[in-house]
Every structure is written in C-alpha cells, then in structure tokens.
C-alpha cells in the first residue's frame, strides 16, 4: 500500500488495558489517551511503539512542535483531545514558571532544552567531542538514546558556543530565547546575560520595516491577514464539526451494533474488512459520513483514511505496493441493508453528502523521523564526525613497531577524535606495518578474526590533511585483505529541523549492524546430509536437515519493500536427530545485515507432524505449497532464494588451504594459482558490492538466480529510458534486491532509477558470475589426497601456464610494452612487472584457427579483478549473457581490450593494501574495424566489419610498433592521435565473437601507489 510519511510519534486511544507505560510501568487503561515514540524492534524488521500515559509522555522530555505533521493518528482523535495535545506541545511539554518581564506574559519553559553547570568532568560535548569540565556551563537537548530507548529522552550536552553553532539542527527555533531553557533561573547573573546574548529570540521586525520602505500598503496587508484569519477560523469550525460528526457516529455505532454487524455493513458496501475492532469502526464511520469508497483506479485496491489523505492498501504487482494517495477519492452512496433498519440509530440516521475536509498543509512540515533503534551503528564512513575530528567515536589499535612511540601515536589519534584501545574485538581500525601483516603474529590473527581493517601509519598524517573522504583514505592505505567495514561508536540521534534536515548521502541509520565478523562466524555452517544446520538452532552437532523424496527441508526466503524500508529474511529448517527419532522445526527471521531479528526452535511429536508443520509455515510465508513446481510470488509474501548448501563445502576448505611441499609446479605458478583461488579475496569482493555474506555466502550463488537478476536490470534500463512510472521502478528494484540479498544495514534499499545504478549492478553481476565459476571449480573435481591442493586447483584451470624467463627477448618486449603505454593521466601508481606467464588455454588455439588468416591482428591488454581469473582461464573471456542490459557497456556486449596498459590495469581494482593485480595480453583478430568516437550500443556489426575501435585522443606511436609472428605489438609511447572530437582519452577495441581472441600472456603486476594520491 501507499505509505504515509514515517512519523516518530503516535497517539491513539488504548485498544486494550494490556500495555504498560514506559515511564511509570503502570498499565494504560483501555480507551485512555496514550502517546508513543516509534523505535526499531530488536526482534524483527520493523518499528514498534513505546507507549506512555499522556502525562508521562511529556515528563520524559519528548518535544513536539507541530502535532498535526509530527504525530501519527493526531487527526483521528476527538477534537478536544487534539486541542489538548496542541496546547501541551505549545507549552513545550512541561509548563514552567518562566520569567516575567515588564508585567508581560510568563515565558514558557522548554522541556527538551536545559542549562546547568556540569556536575562532573565525565560528559563530552556532542558538537566538538571535547570534554566538558566540572563546573563549566553546559546546554542540553533531550534525545532518544539509540542504545537504550527504554530510558526515554536523555540529555545530550554541548558547550554553549557549540550549541549556538548547531542551533538550527537541534531544533532551537528562532523565536526561542535563552531564558526559556530549563534551569536558566539557577544560573549566575553574569552567565544569564552572556547566554541571552548568545541565544536571543530572533524577531521578524526587519521585513515589516522593509515592506513599508518599499511602499507596500500596510492597510491592505492587514485586511489580507484578517481575511486569511477569518478563512482559517471558518475551516477550523468546519473541521471541528466534521470531527464531532464522525465521533458521534462511532459512539452511536458502538452502542447499537456488534463487531459482526459492522463487518456486515462493510461487506454489503463492498469495502474490505480490516483486522481490529477500532479499525472496523473507523471504516464504517468514514463510509457513513462521506460515502462508500470506490476501488483504487490504479490497482483496484481498498483506499483507507490516514491523517492527511486516503492511501491505497493494494498492490500494483506481487512485488510492489500501490502508491496512490488522494484527498478526493471517488465514492458512492453508503447503503444500509434492510435487515439493519430495525436498529433505531441506523433507521433514523440521515447524513447530508459531504467531502472530507483536511487541515491546510503546514508551511514547515516536520522532517521524516530518523531511524530510532535499539542498538548502535557501525558505519563505513564517519559522516557525523566534525571536519577536524575525522576519527570521532572510533577506537584505534596500534600493532608492531611504528615510527612514532605509543604516546605520540595516542596523542595524534586523540587529536583526531579517536581513542586508543588494546583489544582487537573493540577496535574500529588497526594501524600497523606491512611487515607485521605478513608476519601474522598471534595478535594480528586476533585482528583478522575480528575482521578489523589494517592501515599503514601514513593514514594518520593524510586523514588530518586530505580533503578526501575517510573511506577513500582507508582504501588507499589499507594493508589487509580483510576488514570490509570500519565501525564507529554510536553518536547522538539528532532530529533535524528546517533546511538542514536534508540527510547526507553518506549517512547511515543509528542501528548496530551485524559486522562482517559476525557474518563470518555465522558462515561456519555444519554440513550434514543435503544442507547446513543453522548454528543458531544449537543443534548443529546433534542433528541434520531432513531430506525426503530428494527434497531438502530447508528454505531461505527474502522480502524487500523499498517504500516501507524493509529488507527482511526468513529461514526455515526441519531438523532430525542424528541418533534418535526426534524432530525440530527451526526458524529465524530479521533484517538482512543487522542483528535485528530472532529465532524459534520447536520440538515436534513425530516426523509426520514436523513435515506438516514445516509445509504449513512455508505456505503461510510464501503463499505456495512446499511441493509446488512453479513458484508464484504473492503480495506481501516472501520469495525463496536458491541457496545451494552443497555437501562439498569441506572440499573447498581442503583445497583452499596453503600449499604443502608436494607440488611440482614452479614456485611463481604455485603463487599464481593460490592468488586466483583465494577465498578471502572473493569474500572481500562480495562485501564491496554490499552483498550479504550471511544470506548469500560464497558458493551459494546460483547461476540461474544471477541470470534472472540480469533480466531485471534489462527491464530497469528499459523503464528508465522510457520514463516509466515510479511504481514500475519500485517493482523492479524490490525484485532485484530480493533475488540478490544486499546488506544495507538500516538504510532503505536505494531505488534503481538511473543508468549509473544499472551499470554498477551489471558490473557486480559480471563479477558474481566469475566468482561463482571459481567457487564451483574449488568445490568440484578430484578429491585425490595424494596431490597438493595447488596442483588440484591448477588442473581445474585447464590452462598450460609456463613462466617466461626474465632475460628472454619476449619478456623484454612485454616489459617495454608495459613501460611505454602507461598513460600520463593514470598517475596514481607505477607498474612493476613481477612475473610473466605464457598461457595456452585448452581448445582455444583450435577455436581461433579460422581467424589466424584475418588481417589486422594485435596483441592487446585486458585487465580484470583477481577473483575473475579462475573463470577467465577455465572458460576464456566471455561476452555478457543475453539477459544483461546493453547500457552497461559503452559499445554493447563484447570483449574489450586496450593498447595502453594502464587503461586495462585500472580494471584490476587494486589498492595500496592489496597492490598485486593480474592482467592479460591476448592476440585479437580485429580485421576491418568500425571506428567510433562516442558510445553506441552495438548489437550487430555493419556488413564487412569484424570489430569496433573506440577512437581515443592519445594512442601508442604507430611508428614504434613491432610485429611478432604476424601480430602487431603497439608498444610505442603515447602521442596525440589527431582525433579530438571524441569522448575517449585512449583507444578501445571490442570484438563480438569469443573465437576472435587467443590469450597469450598473463602478467602479475605490482601497483606502486604514490604516497600522495591527491
């Protein structure tokens, strides 16, 4: 359904007497006015209300400026209660004595702002992150503690100057003054005067005087204002009358009709029956007062009144809710069935047909509430940190011998806002040396186990001086292959106000996300039979997943709703004891990539009962029978993910171990194979793409699922280019994220609504396909324990790999090609050739044979991530699958090459912490080239053309090219090509037939990043 703006607060009449107040712990009587703050549930992917008695709500310091826009359910209250909420909010929640001036009215004390002298030196200013000394004046804003919302609103302290700087963000309005602060009267006379000057009430006199100067008729203005006030008063009276009419109908219906009667009335008038007595009563009263609602024109769903409009509760597709919202829905006359006319109230009820009125939209609507949560958030980018304190709320561990001593390092870290820690488990970041990482001491093993990123010492210097983002600096100085995320300790949750409320693109919700360390631990699944037993069941060592009739009773389900902001999972397993006839149903649920969620283990009386219960739960969650061959997606129901928990996981572990002494392969080849099949690198690549390793661990990627995701991206590309509706874009985005689980923490999954996002996801799927190939190779094939794991993996590549002698002529030619064709604009690194391998893929030479006679054959570069090379060597360079959208590639789906080494090297995706990359040299049969200067989505080459050449402004000097065995090697230095009206800096070569490529060499390169990247 269309979702109303998410609001931080809620108000209603208690539906029962079961809820207890979060402040006084007393029960809240049924039908009494109660208020709540909405917080993220720790048990499931959604928000829950924390209820208070009306009076208790204000006592804990909740502050509301505009109840009509900030409080959900406000307009559904009785008129008198609406006024009660408004008046209490206007009084700042807590009415204070105030200060009297010149016989004027007493000022209202603001309940959520306070001033006092610090009672100790333990508090920290939330503006500058410096300590507030004991006895120093401090100001506070009450906010919800993200870790302990049950405590209600607590003080977040600031130095007075820091408070003044953040006045707008903290919601201290222009009309407020220092004298309205709680505790102001207890300050010294001197501090009162100083504070009054710092926090004056800003009056809007200037504009009036300016208007007079401009000759604006003040009399006319006053008349206009009077007219507006009269109009406003008239609307208010009408709203009051409307409210009283609706509540009169509700009161009379409660006396005269049973809940079943009300349901019958809704059914007779072709309205959906909601759950809950109060919701049923609301719908009937709305229909009687304004007419029966006609179905939504977009999806034929039911429209429902919610505060500021009628929202559709239907679904556009099985994946996406309808977005229709209107204040003028189509209606028909409400009809009372004959049998109900015996009820005296319904018999005499006559209501004049009218439209529902809505209060005018506020000129300064409340901003959407920030995510309020039970726990804190580790974030990849410390966006909330002050510019001069980039390491705010971060704990840093130092390891090994640094150029600075420990005290100097500590001083520098604290100056940047961080804190020193001695524990790997508590650390956000580790500062060490490359030597220490290679040594892999016991302490470094702890750092790796905790998945804490390691950076070099230069990071501290650059983070204080560079304008680059923290994330870029972390990547540039990284020394470890692990550590996908940098944790930041929780800061405050600020409810932004005014223009400054626009959320930062890099901001993340204040919820503790499940770090990769946690994910890694949960990935240690115990495999028995056909699937992995979830360790959260506590039965991984004593039970296995039941397999019956060739079907494994284990399911992982996903559900994404971008509008609502949910990114949910549901896991279901039927477990059978290893030793006796005992059975359990285990299920777990929550939000992907976070600790939010829970689980349940139920012991079943028998195998039959367990199977029946499993199938019932599966059908309840998906709408499909367990044994159904063709799955149908239903609205609001989960979708099954093809997670392949194969029995060959142990084989992967065996083959992924470090090589022994059995291998007969040359040492450089051994190292190359180890690099290509490095499982940690594969995991890191997935994490970079925000793939959720817990829901979709390595090796669980189904090729069919990836291809289905490509198809969705093709539809997205089409929808974007055709300017399709928001509903269609939403639908496709929901489907994509359900199919490929992403870890967004508490952020809403982003809409796939532009070509850039499509391109990024296409690149992600390209890499996933290659990782899937690599992992499939690791799992399959020989299990010969007499062979070294490296040799076993080498055989799976089906490629003859020979080390080229460093002193040979061909090695000299290749090194010259590397040196001469490094582009001047690619100056962040230099390339050093470590090893050169001559490669011959099985069957490729035979496949290439027909093209050996084609003219214009060149030796060209092709770079790719290390994780893609198992797929490249075992299957060759491939063209994107037909399901992939064309827009992901500049010149359509083909195999891309370059004549400038650094152009291809950029696709190796190396970093300062991971500087080794692999690059290919392939003989490419280009023939007649179709020359282009701008992007063109080629699906078929023009007649007589064999390839595409994207013309660049710079190209290797053609006079320096050499020819080896009829193949041109363009190893000249880069010179202007004479082509200026092109969008490319350097040449690109694309072939659309895989047989036109014969891979010749593989180079292992070291990227020597320059110390200053800016």
From Swiss-Prot:
Record PTM PolyADP-ribosyl aspartic acid, positions in chain: 388
Entry text on domains: The two PARP-type zinc-fingers (also named Zn1 and Zn2) specifically recognize DNA strand breaks: PARP-type zinc-finger 1 binds PARP-type zinc-finger 2 from a separate PARP1 molecule to form a dimeric module that specifically recognizes DNA strand breaks.
Residue segments, region Automodification domain: 374-524
Gene from which the chain derives: Parp1
GO molecular function: chromatin binding; damaged DNA binding; DNA binding; enzyme activator activity; enzyme binding; histone deacetylase binding; identical protein binding; NAD binding
Amino-acid positions noted as binding Zn(2+) 3 in the UniProt annotation, renumbered to this chain: 296, 299, 312, 322
EC number: 2.4.2.30, 2.4.2.-
Alphabetical list of InterPro entries matching this protein: ARTD/PARP (IPR050800), BRCT_dom (IPR001357), BRCT_dom_sf (IPR036420), PADR1_C_dom_sf (IPR038650), PARP (IPR008288), PARP1-like_PADR1_N (IPR049296), PARP1-like_PADR1_Zn_ribbon (IPR012982), Poly(ADP-ribose)pol_cat_dom (IPR012317)
Upper classification of the organism: Eukaryota, Metazoa, Chordata, Craniata, Vertebrata
Protein name, UniProt field: Poly [ADP-ribose] polymerase 1
PADR1 zinc-binding domain location: 225-360
Compartments where found: Chromosome; Nucleus; Nucleus, Nucleolus; Cytoplasm, Cytosol
CDD domains named in the record: BRCT_PARP1, parp_like, WGR_PARP1_like
Domain PARP alpha-helical span(s) in chain numbering: 662-779
Organism of provenance: Rattus norvegicus (Rat)
Modified residues (N6-acetyllysine): 97, 105, 131, 600, 621
PTM text: Poly-ADP-ribosylated on serine, glutamate and aspartate residues by autocatalysis. Auto-ADP-ribosylation on serine takes place following interaction with HPF1. Auto poly-ADP-ribosylation on serine residues promotes its dissociation from chromatin. Poly-ADP-ribosylated by PARP2; poly-ADP-ribosylation mediates the recruitment of CHD1L to DNA damage sites. Mono-ADP-ribosylated at Lys-521 by SIRT6 in response to oxidative stress, promoting recruitment to double-strand breaks (DSBs) sites.
Chain ranges of zinc fingers (PARP-type): 9-93, 113-203
Enzymatic reactions: NAD(+) + (ADP-D-ribosyl)n-acceptor = nicotinamide + (ADP-D-ribosyl)n+1-acceptor + H(+); L-seryl-[protein] + NAD(+) = O-(ADP-D-ribosyl)-L-seryl-[protein] + nicotinamide + H(+); L-aspartyl-[protein] + NAD(+) = 4-O-(ADP-D-ribosyl)-L-aspartyl-[protein] + nicotinamide; L-glutamyl-[protein] + NAD(+) = 5-O-(ADP-D-ribosyl)-L-glutamyl-[protein] + nicotinamide
PolyADP-ribosyl glutamic acid PTM positions: 408, 414, 436, 438, 445-446, 457, 485, 489, 492, 513-514, 520
Regulation: ADP-ribosyltransferase activity is regulated via an allosteric activation mechanism. In absence of activation signal, PARP1 is autoinhibited by the PARP alpha-helical domain (also named HD region), which prevents effective NAD(+)-binding. Activity is highly stimulated by signals, such as DNA strand breaks. Binding to damaged DNA unfolds the PARP alpha-helical domain, relieving autoinhibition.
């Amino acid at each position: 359904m269309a979702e109303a703006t998410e609001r931080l607060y809620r108000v209603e009449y208690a539906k029962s007497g079961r809820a207890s107040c979060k402040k006084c712990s007393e029960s809240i009587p049924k039908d009494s006015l109660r208020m709540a703050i909405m917080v993220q549930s720790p048990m499931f992917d959604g928000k829950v209300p924390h209820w208070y008695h009306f009076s208790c709500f204000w006592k804990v310091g909740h502050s509301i400026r505009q109840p009509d826009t900030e409080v959900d359910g406000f307009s559904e209250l009785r008129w008198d209660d609406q006024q009660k909420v408004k008046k209490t909010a206007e009084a700042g929640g807590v009415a204070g004595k105030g200060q009297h001036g010149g016989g004027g009215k007493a000022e209202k004390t603001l309940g959520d702002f306070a001033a006092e002298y610090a009672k100790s030196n333990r508090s920290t200013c939330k503006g500058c992150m410096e300590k507030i000394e004991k006895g120093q004046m401090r100001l506070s804003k009450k906010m919800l503690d993200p870790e302990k919302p049950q405590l209600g609103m607590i003080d977040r302290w600031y130095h007075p100057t820091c408070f003044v700087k953040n006045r707008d963000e903290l919601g201290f309005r222009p009309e407020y003054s220092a004298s309205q602060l709680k505790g102001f009267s207890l300050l010294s006379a001197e501090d009162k005067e100083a504070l009054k000057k710092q926090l004056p009430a800003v009056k809007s006199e200037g504009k009036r005087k300016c208007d007079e100067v401009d000759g604006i008729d003040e009399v006319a203005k006053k008349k206009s204002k009077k007219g507006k006030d009269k109009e406003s008063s008239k609307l208010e009276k009408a709203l009051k009358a409307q409210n009283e009419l609706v509540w009169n109908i509700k009161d009379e219906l409660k006396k005269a009709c049973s809940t079943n009667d009300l349901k019958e009335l809704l059914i007779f008038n072709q309205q959906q029956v909601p759950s809950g007595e109060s919701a049923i009563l609301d719908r009937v009263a709305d229909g009687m007062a304004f007419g029966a609602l006609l179905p939504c024109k977009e999806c034929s769903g039911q429209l429902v009144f919610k505060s500021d409009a009628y929202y559709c509760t239907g679904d556009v597709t099985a994946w996406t809710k309808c977005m229709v919202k209107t204040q003028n829905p189509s209606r028909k006359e409400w009809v009372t069935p004959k049998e109900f006319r015996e009820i005296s109230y319904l018999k005499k009820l006559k209501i004049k047909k009218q439209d529902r009125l809505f209060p005018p939209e506020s000129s300064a609507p409340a901003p959407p509430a920030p995510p309020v949560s039970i726990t804190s958030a580790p974030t990849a980018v410390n966006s909330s940190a002050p510019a001069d304190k980039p390491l705010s709320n971060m704990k840093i561990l130092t390891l090994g011998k640094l150029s600075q001593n420990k005290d100097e390092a500590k001083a520098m870290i604290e100056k940047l806002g961080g804190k020193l820690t001695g524990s790997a488990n508590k650390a956000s970041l580790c500062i060490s040396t490359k030597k220490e990482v290679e040594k892999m001491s016991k302490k470094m093993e702890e750092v790796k186990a905790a998945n804490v990123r390691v950076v070099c010492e230069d990071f501290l210097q650059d983070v204080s001086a560079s304008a680059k983002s923290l994330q870029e600096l972390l990547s540039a100085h990284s020394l470890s292959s692990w550590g996908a995320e940098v944790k930041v300790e929780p800061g405050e949750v600020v409810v932004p106000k005014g223009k400054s409320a626009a959320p930062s693109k890099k901001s993340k919700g204040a919820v503790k996300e499940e770090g990769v360390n946690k994910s890694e631990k949960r990935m240690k699944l115990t495999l028995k039979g056909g699937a992995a037993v979830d360790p959260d069941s506590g039965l991984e060592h004593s039970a296995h997943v039941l397999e019956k009739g060739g079907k494994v009773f284990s399911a992982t389900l996903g559900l994404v709703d971008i509008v609502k902001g949910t990114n949910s999972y549901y896991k279901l397993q039927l477990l059978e004891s290893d030793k006796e006839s005992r059975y359990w149903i285990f299920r777990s649920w929550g939000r992907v990539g976070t600790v939010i969620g829970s689980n349940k283990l139920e012991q079943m009386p028998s195998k039959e009962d367990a199977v029946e219960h499993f199938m019932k739960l599966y059908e309840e969650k998906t709408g499909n029978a367990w044994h159904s061959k063709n799955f149908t997606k239903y609205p609001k129901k989960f979708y099954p993910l093809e997670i392949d928990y194969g029995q060959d996981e142990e084989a992967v572990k065996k083959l992924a171990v470090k090589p022994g002494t059995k291998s007969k392969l040359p040492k450089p080849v051994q190292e190359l194979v180890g690099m290509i099949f490095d499982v940690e690198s594969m995991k890191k690549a997935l994490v970079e793409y925000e793939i959720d390793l817990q829901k979709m661990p390595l090796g669980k990627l189904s090729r069919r699922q990836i291809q289905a995701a490509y198809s969705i991206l093709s539809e997205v590309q089409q929808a974007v280019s055709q300017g399709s509706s928001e509903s269609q874009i939403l639908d496709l985005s929901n489907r994509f994220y359900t199919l490929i689980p992403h870890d967004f923490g508490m952020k809403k999954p982003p809409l796939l609504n532009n070509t850039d996002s499509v391109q990024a996801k296409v690149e992600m799927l390209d890499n996933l396909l290659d990782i899937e190939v690599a992992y499939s190779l690791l799992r399959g094939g020989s299990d010969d324990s007499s062979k070294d794991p490296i040799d076993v993996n080498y055989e799976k590549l089906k490629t003859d790999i020979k080390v080229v002698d460093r002193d040979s002529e061909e090695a000299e030619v290749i090194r010259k090609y590397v040196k001469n064709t490094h582009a001047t604009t690619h100056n962040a690194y230099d390339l050093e050739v470590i090893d050169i391998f001559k490669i011959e893929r099985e069957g490729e030479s035979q496949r290439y044979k027909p093209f050996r006679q084609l003219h214009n054959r060149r030796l060209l570069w092709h770079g790719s991530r290390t994780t893609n090379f198992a797929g490249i060597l075992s299957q060759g360079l491939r063209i994107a699958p037909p399901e992939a959208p064309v827009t992901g590639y500049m010149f359509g789906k083909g195999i891309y090459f370059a004549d400038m080494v650094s152009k291809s090297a950029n696709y190796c995706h190396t970093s300062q912490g991971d500087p080794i990359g692999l690059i290919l040299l392939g003989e490419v049969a280009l023939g007649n080239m179709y020359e282009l200067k701008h992007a063109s989505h080629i699906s078929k080459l023009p007649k007589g053309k064999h390839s595409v050449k994207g013309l660049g402004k710079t190209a290797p000097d053609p006079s320096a090219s050499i020819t080896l065995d009829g193949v041109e090697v363009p190893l000249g230095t880069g010179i202007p090509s004479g082509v200026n009206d092109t969008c490319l800096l350097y040449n690109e070569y694309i072939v659309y037939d895989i047989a036109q490529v014969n891979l010749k060499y593989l180079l292992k390169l070291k990227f020597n990043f320059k110390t200053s990247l800016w």
